[in-house]
Amino acid sequence: MSKYEVLQGFYAVHDELGSGGFGKVRLATHLLTNQKVAIKIIDKKQLGHDLPRVQTEMDALRNLSHQNICRLYHYIETEDKFFIVMEYCSGGEMFDYIVRKERLEESEARHFFRQLVSAIAFVHSQGYAHRDLKPENLLLTEDLHLKLIDFGLCAKTEKGRIDKHNLDTCCGSPAYAAPELIQGLQYKGNEADVWSMGILLYTLLVGALPFEDDNMQIMYKKIQSGCFYEPEFLSPLSKQLLRAMLQVVPERRISVKKLLEHDWLNHKYTQPVKWNTIYDKNFIDRDVARVMSKYYGFESTDKMIEKIKEWNFDYMTSTYYALLHRKRNGMEIILPMVRNSTNTAPPNVQNILCSPTIHASLENNLDKSGLEDDDSDPSSISSSSDISARLKKNCVVSDESSSSRFVKPMSPAAEKDKKMSYVNAMLTMPSQFTGRSPLRIPESPMSVRSSDSASLGSAATPSRGGVKDNDKENASTGKNYRMGASTCKSRGPLKITGVEEGTMKSVYTTPNTRPTLRGLFSPGNAEHKKRQRARSSDRASIGMPPGSPVSIGSAHSANNELLADGRTPRSRIKTNRLPQRVFTSLERKKEKLITLLTPRKMQRDSPQVLKDVKNMVNVSMTASQDPEEVRNLLKKVFDDERMRYELNGWKFLATQETVHGWMTVELEIVRLQMFDKVGIRRKRLKGDAFMYKKVCEKILQMAKIE
């Protein structure tokens, strides 16, 4: 029995993205659409008295649908677990971006902070207070859009009266908590969130915490004093804003309304921050609904729309969001033609909490005022996948022109240029602090091609020829290529070309140059296909050593009768080794089938190969070309620092005890094909973000790999 039986047939669960006190977050694939999602798995036994927090988080996520808040797709409750399926943010944690650049330029910090203020202004307008704002709860999409997560500690008040309601629960992370929380006083949620945003802004601009100490009591005293260091490189406007947000007395603290109008926040922007949601719960994309109606067997698109509007947050809701994500990224909207009759949910899947939510896109309201305008909706790099004619006959595809209210996708080339203009500007901007950009070296003009995602073997799995997933992930996803893979994507028999004519071709010899492989059934091979059988006996006799099984069989067949057209009967040219040859053929076909159905694996003696790391802010490039050397250096650092670690191939899982608890980080040695260098991919699995930053910087510095 599977560990996550309730997810079988709906999601394929992959690597761990992170963990907390009550559960883990795993990367997964939505099987019907092949889109990546994140699944938060919470153990009820570990929750104990905190069980109501999950219900609070679910209520918040259903109602807080905003462009800068991570979207809820699907909610499943079983006897012992909660499964929260959410939008996957492939850009990783915001803190990885800070670790990569050490601190951000003010224009970069402004880009992200405007999005955070937009999200919090909307949260407060709906009567919620987040109460746990910290870098770990800020994620990035592949196009550097910020998404707020983790509403487990949020507080709900009457809508529009958050500034009138007092709270008394002390919660959140100490380094980001407001003074009134530390003192145990009653507080207002909106004022506490403004303080935490001030800490985050300081972190973005300086790369450090304003109030920090290994001794918790000393750190509390620093927070209550409100005194913090102001580096000289900060502009007067940024200093003014930080002082206004980090006021010890809550009544003197700047309000969110005034924060939205502050000069620093709107510097070089043509429009103020748009904090209202761009989604409308009453608007459903008709293209997506039409495809879903054919799959689910609804009589009309309108019937499907009415069903989606129930917002049950079941697999149907998840499918709608996944297809909507494909459309927004210029990918084809496609589902199998007929719903599999065996694709029924297990009984415990039916135990799903249901409630309406705000959603649906009003993309035309986005701010299009320029590169720095944060509210614009950059499209994805991903282009539409190539769908064969045979597949299209068996699949449902949207056939309506883009006449709906949803923005029509641009051409793949235009989409890529539009998005990369800003992403590259952000990632290649040199830092004043370090003097280098996150990439640190020029881009290579090499082309990038996505690979297939892992095979999905279940009743609900689309056919193998389905649309490829063009999402870009930090984890092992479509853009990660591995060395030593022996698979070949050509279909059917292969013809070897590129060998000089006139040279004797023996099946036991290898050409000096690497041959070109091409499918035998391509248009250019029509004549070859007609002549193939006629030359089968000739192939066996050319270049064979005397006495070999093939040459003996050929000599024997020469004495047999010929057919009317002069050809030798196929049965006559076979030898008494036929059973063995048939068995060998079957074995080879079995190996090929296994190879096709198994994801590419890296060789044990080679690290994983990454073809493209442009948007991977959690990858550090080394000066070395020898992965073994880097691995030995990391081992030495871990031993010198007396850090516990486990080594699995090229992946380190290191842990260290800190004043804030245990810190767990994953470091994987990879090969950067674009630059012909060895890199290190970082991932924080558990612990405080700043401790993660310190540990990573210390390890990379001591290993002398930056």
UniProtKB/Swiss-Prot annotation:
Pinpoint the Protein kinase domain residues.
11-265
GO MF, one annotated term:
non-membrane spanning protein tyrosine kinase activity
The record's subcellular locations are: Cytoplasm; Cytoplasm, Cytoskeleton, Microtubule organizing center, Centrosome
What is the source species? Caenorhabditis elegans
For domains, the record's comment is: The KA1 domain is required for the control of asymmetric neuroblast division.
What does UniProt give as GO cellular component? centrosome; cytoplasm
Family assignment? Answer: Belongs to the protein kinase superfamily. CAMK Ser/Thr protein kinase family. SNF1 subfamily.
The record's keywords, sorted A to Z, are:
Apoptosis, ATP-binding, Cytoplasm, Cytoskeleton, Developmental protein, Kinase, Neurogenesis, Nucleotide-binding, Serine/threonine-protein kinase, Transferase
> By what name is this protein known?
Maternal embryonic leucine zipper kinase
Function statement: Serine/threonine-protein kinase involved in cell autonomous neuroblast asymmetric divisions that generate one precursor cell and one apoptotic cell by controlling spindle positioning, myosin distribution and the segregation of cell fate determinants. Plays a role in neural fate specification in several dopaminergic linages, acting in concert with ham-1. Involved in phosphorylation of multiple proteins associated with key developmental processes, including the cell cycle, apoptosis, endocytosis, and asymmetric cell division.
* Gene field: pig-1
